[in-house]
Amino acid sequence: MKKILTTPIKAEDLQDIRVGDVIYLTGTLVTCRDVCHRRLIELKRPIPYDLNGKAIFHAGPIVRKNGDKWEMVSVGPTTSMRMESFEREFIEQTGVKLVVGKGGMGPLTEEGCQKFKALHVIFPAGCAVLAATQVEEIEEVHWTELGMPESLWVCRVKEFGPLIVSIDTHGNNLIAENKKLFAERRDPIVEEICEHVHYIK
């Protein structure tokens, strides 16, 4: 059975979810990347949309006008780690509960997710057109002066995913744990190879 989170998301909705789980999102998803984070945290400019209990997507979409409506053409994730220095404060100030992106995030986001009860989840790279099909409607757009990729596109989505949980509300970090595990497995293998093939060193 699919685990589907529906906005507005509450802290108790997240407490039983763990890293490695696969979930889906129904409700409000707002594209929000580098400049948006900088405006809020560095410039102290309030975001013109209430993100409390909502989800953001580290993404730079391609959209087109269809009559008087905007239509999502492609929306793939961008590298979440670029927002690492801002994400803890961003979660605290906005009350956002789901951060969607590509790749993992670091200890600051981990701390923010644990303290303020949020998740970081990974949307598979290379699936931007699939993601666009899961956007039912673009309901609003803000900060259009930033250009298409950096604008805040407020989307209504249905069963958006799959989303792999990389940081949960208990301080677990899937990517960090995997890096440690891979290093532990790699080192003895490299040492053994080096015994037989000396020029590798």
Curated annotation (Swiss-Prot):
UniProt cross-references to Gene3D superfamilies, sorted A to Z: Fe-S hydro-lyase, tartrate dehydratase beta-type, catalytic domain
Inducing factors: Induced by tartrate, via TtdR.
Keyword Lyase found: yes
InterPro entries tied to this protein: Fe-S_hydro-lyase_TtdB-typ_cat (IPR004647), Fe-S_hydroAse_TtdB_cat_sf (IPR036660)
UniProt-annotated catalytic positions: H37
Single GO MF descriptor: L(+)-tartrate dehydratase activity
Single biological process term from Gene Ontology: response to heat
Catalytic activity: (2R,3R)-tartrate = oxaloacetate + H2O
First-level EC class: lyase
Keywords, alphabetical: Lyase
Any one GO CC term of the record: catalytic complex
EC number: 4.2.1.32
Self-association and partners: Heterotetramer of two alpha and two beta subunits.
PANTHER family: L(+)-TARTRATE DEHYDRATASE SUBUNIT BETA
Similarity comment: family membership: Belongs to the class-I fumarase family.
Name under which the protein is recorded: L(+)-tartrate dehydratase subunit beta
Record gene name: ttdB
